[in-house]
Amino acid sequence: MKMNAASIKNQKAEWEALGVKLPAFDHDAMTAKTKEHPVWVHFGAGNIFRGFIAALQQRLLNEGLQDRGIIAADTFDYDIIDKIYTPFDNLTMMVTLNPDGSTSREIIGSVAEGLRADSSDAAMMARFKEIFTDPGLQMISFTITEKGYALYRPDGSLMPVVQADIDEGPAHARHAMSMVAALLFERFQAGAAPLAVVSMDNCSHNGEKLQSSVMTVAKAWAEKGYVGQDFIAYLEDESKIAFPWSMIDKIT
């Protein structure tokens, strides 16, 4: 029995006989509604996201407190999308080790779509633009590690990929932070709807790091004439674009 959208719908008894907990919501309806009117995109589709963040969204869906899921994206390891998400209809088997040594298993179905944030893939980038220009999008979040926000080399110079992104403008963004800045520019041009831009990485002042990197790229584009100062003002207006800080644990 393969884990996919059809099996969790049509083979519920078989899954439950194996002791696997299934989504308590209409997975097909959630997927369709999320794709049509997305509210949340998460960058960094690895295990922390699947085992914690997606699991929390599943709890809200199970309780009827949400009707849409998450669109997962990866900016670095595209195999995660191609080999782990797509073949299994974006479902994840979460296995929890309990205090008594037993395990519990649950299929996490809160991810509606998996995307490769690959600037060389025209179809993927068209889908990202479609999502980011939807005024109903509420939040984009990140678990890309602290290194994912870095723009500079140890000698203080910009990484070559970042420098190329700055020189070539929003249409050719490749680095994760450049891509986010470019997609926010698309949102600005489509009506300047508000958005929460939320780092969920375990590093001190995570929101500040994310904001600094996005603003560095955006301001460099403004200096080169790729974007106007009105876009910079949009990014700096906290009533429009918010970069909150989040606490993952008490280490930082």
Report the location of each language-model feature:
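Conserved small-residue
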Residues: M1-W245, K250
